[in-house]
């Protein structure tokens, strides 16, 4: 028997050549073994022949993504794993989304609010588009890849009363039917995902109550959406009405407006425009934060301290009258391992009692 062992060939080969070369690499009388971090090489590698090495404290585990999957399931995964999505094979945790808005905005929100990127956390955010969550999430299982996979999707709960009344116009009746239909699909989606994740501790779905755009405002982020009204509308009267709608406390009003804006611009472009106005003041929707904490369960004291330091710096830039003296002292102790997260949270709460970092700390305790 002949063996050919290649270690990290991507260090010496151009991206395009990697894909071409390893797609054609086949010797009938030779077993070829190669180690790689290349998404290009992973893309053209048969998923049945892939082994993932996971470094643990003082040992390594080996995962085989195709274990116990039927031929059709393997084929689905193989077709899906292109150069971008093979990132999930290398990630410490994975978040699956199905929309352009989530794919564009979530990394921006995390970076601007926490001062650290998803990449730094070891989390890959993958847009599955129309593939179907189950086709990808099936890779994460006790028998396959033992890494956490969070699914982010919409429950599409109704943003208005869908009861049809005698005086409703045809347009209003049509709108109510559409809202009711979306709600029904959302319930069906949840039922399906509940059954899929049952008994699998590596996969969990997290839901926006309505949709990403609506829940973004519900979380207290109307200001960010207001900033792009002038980009969406030209007519002064429409701009004024849109601002009034977005500032409304009624989800039926601001929900309909933000969805209208997103549809008019296209959700992807709408997200790009919105991304320019994300800041440390933007509130991370609760279901997204929960998904992040599921995808990556443990955080070193240095990462937590860096996030808190970032929040303090941003608040101090906005208001240099804030006194973080005690917080800084406790933060140093926390980095050195001489106090607990609870101690740090207590001092931070005295200075900024409403800061969202306290929610994160509470979830990490």
Predicted regions: what is each one?
Residues 2-3, 27-33:
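Loop/turn-to-beta-strand initiation segments
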Residues 42, 51, 55-365:
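Acidic, divalent-metal-binding catalytic cores of TOPRIM
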Residues 35-37:
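H-loop/switch region of ABC-family ATPase nucleotide-binding domains
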Residues 10-11, 39:
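Catalytic acidic motif of RecA-like/P-loop NTPases
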Residues 11-15, 19, 44:
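Conserved D-loop-proximal element of ABC-family nucleotide-binding domains
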Residues 1-6, 15:
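GG-anchored amphipathic helix commonly corresponding to the ABC/SMC/Rad50 NBD signature/C-loop
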Residues 28, 45-46:
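Short, structured coil segments at secondary-structure junctions
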Residues 20-21, 25:
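Conserved hydrophobic alpha-helix in the ABC-type ATPase nucleotide-binding domain
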